[in-house]
């Protein structure tokens, strides 16, 4: 078992896993995820494979249509996590243990700086080394000093940070979900239209109410921003939280995040002889802008002389344009105004707001993991330096002081530092 863990702790094995994960993520970025089988049959046909091999059968066989949720991708993440844990225990911890040990020696090997000097100022040299931030220990006539032990400990936290990120990714793949809802103003809804989910996903039964929806426009009638005011409703029907969301400003409640994504117009509410009725609209586009069309009948459908007016809506400002049967603009009507002979009154635009709801149980692991990763990566670049001093007593009260030093980084800086400490103490 120990041999297996040593193989897992091998750097080449970890790099190979990282390479496989990177290639897999690349495929996940190129191939559209969580689409229907017909979509892949249409875009990845057997007759003209992309790259000479990528067809819908290959995608379906290797589950490339939902890469981040399939078993072999999660297995790669788990393998990398186990490799990092093994590396931490078999390589990092022994190195830390060695670094914390007081390693006294008269002649250490492979040093970056070495000098001998006759001086009566050995005490001053030791004090100077301590003032440079070294922790100095004494054993009889030998001294040992270390500096930057955090640089040896930080790689352990780098590994732990990556493990946190991997755990967060696995939790998100297994238990997260994504839902798209189109909800009318004033309606209460539950999460239903789930577009993607993991095998261990548990859908929330949280009730949400859309209190209002509105749009801000630029002076040229281009949409500036659209907003939805949402309320979180508890089991007793009481509002526990409310917030106005917009694009890039979501509502976060417990493990749910509500994003503003889209909007649409469903119809118009018209009043006729003190009775309200609704007429649907058809959406089309004109110069890449949304336009809605509808037809308002002015007489009964059973009448032989059926007449009506065509209505066009091109924004959500509350204005409609009425055209006659010849396609000529008849009039422009605002909300609460009459359309025809004071019998038909425009009451309301019937709109829906697009809300994307996401649940990611691993998001905290990922955030903390990246936070620790940034800090620990910076700390891991700190040099770990060691200094050895050996004292030999000579005749006439003279002292021969042997100074050795080495570091794992910034070797030139260490050599310069030791030279400055010793040059005036001869």
UniProtKB/Swiss-Prot annotation:
Biological role stated in the UniProt entry: Required during biogenesis of c-type cytochromes (cytochrome c6 and cytochrome f) at the step of heme attachment.
Family listed: Belongs to the Ccs1/CcsB family.
Compartments, as annotated in UniProt: Plastid, Chloroplast thylakoid membrane
Regions that span the bilayer: 11-31, 70-90, 153-173
HAMAP family: CytC_Ccs1
GO biological process: cytochrome complex assembly
Assembly description: May interact with CcsA.
Name of one Pfam family that matches: ResB
InterPro entries: Cyt_c_bgen_Ccs1/CcsB/ResB (IPR023494), ResB-like_domain (IPR007816)
Keywords attached to this entry: Chloroplast, Cytochrome c-type biogenesis, Membrane, Plastid, Thylakoid, Transmembrane, Transmembrane helix
Any one Gene Ontology cellular component term annotated for this protein: chloroplast thylakoid membrane
Protein name per the record: Cytochrome c biogenesis protein Ccs1
